[in-house]
Amino acid sequence: MESAMFGLETPLMTALQHLLDIPDGEGGAAGKQGATGGPTRAYVRDARAMAATPADVKDLPGAYAFVVDMPGLKSSDIKVQVEEERLLVISGERRRGGGEEEKEESCKYLRMERRMGKFMRKFVLPDNADVDKISAVCQDGVLTVTVEKLPPPEPKKPKTIEVKVA
């Protein structure tokens, strides 16, 4: 049953759903299909996490800027790719930190509110985007992907055709 229907989308309910995940065994391609033929809980959870990655898209005079909050992530956790020539894909995975206090056996979480797991955003780039001039910078937990624009095509000058006398 969907917990969001009852307003129970809380860290506790998310943790309970995670605990109730049953291994899929041989349930379909890439873990997308469970034993019952429907999507697995893990697949649905990942799809939800991917859809919950907010981004700002800016149209600047010479470039497009895609701004995504990435708190606590290292550059090695983030992947920026261009697929099928015009599809910008920003993806990665957030993991729990492995600090010394978490390695102790006596450590237990009293509250788990930070979102962990996979994230992904896809953007179709405009025709005037220069896919060969893309840069990505992650500073203070904010990823900025800049895609430069191609220069506008020069207007075609009319071609004059000489009329000959026959």
Curated annotation (Swiss-Prot):
Gene3D superfamilies: 2.60.40.790
Subcellular location: Cytoplasm
Induction: By heat shock.
PROSITE patterns linked: SHSP
Keywords in alphabetical order: Cytoplasm, Stress response
GO molecular function: unfolded protein binding
Domain of life: Eukaryota
Coiled coil: none
Entry annotated with the keyword Cell membrane: no
Domain sHSP: 46-166
Pfam families found in the cross-reference section: HSP20
Biological process according to GO: protein complex oligomerization; protein folding; response to heat; response to hydrogen peroxide; response to salt stress
Record's GO cellular component terms: cytoplasm
InterPro entries listed in its UniProt record: A-crystallin/Hsp20_dom (IPR002068), HSP20-like_chaperone (IPR008978), Small_HSP (IPR031107)
Assembly: May form oligomeric structures.
UniProt family annotation: Belongs to the small heat shock protein (HSP20) family.
PANTHER family named among the record's database cross-references: HEAT-SHOCK PROTEIN 20 FAMILY MEMBER
Protein known as: 18.0 kDa class II heat shock protein
Native organism: Oryza sativa subsp. japonica
